Amino acid sequence: MPVGTYGVVKTIDFNDLNILGFDIILSNTFHIMLTPGINVINCIKGLYKFINWKKGILTDSGGYQIFSLNKNILLNDGIKFKQFYSGNFVFMTPEKSIHLQHYFKSDIIMCLDDCIRYPTIFKNSWKSVNLSLFWAKRCKKVHNKT
């Protein structure tokens, strides 16, 4: 599955992806939320029209990208992180992640998860899995409502 972080796969155009037989691309909720932004995607009526792609789109939750930032604060409600473009703080909740992926009109969406550094101890893994499960239930609830 080709990766199109911002919706566009680098170094290859969509005609070539079609010729190669790819039926889906992976895009990143976190990055698209920041640039070009939800307002742009919403005005254009979804990620498909923005990138002019007619096949499947899988969007991840953005959890790993937020985890990889040094300035993040993990809470039960979500993750507060410092935006690397502007320096402003943004709060990503499980519900917001799902809403964004619905705005993008993704075919396959992922729930927000807590990513932890490796190596780690069992206690940290246990806590991370339980938080991810808690968030997954919240994601499912909002997904089922929309």
Predicted ranges, named:
Residues M1-N144:
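Non-catalytic, usually N-terminal nucleic-acid engagement modules in DNA/RNA processing proteins
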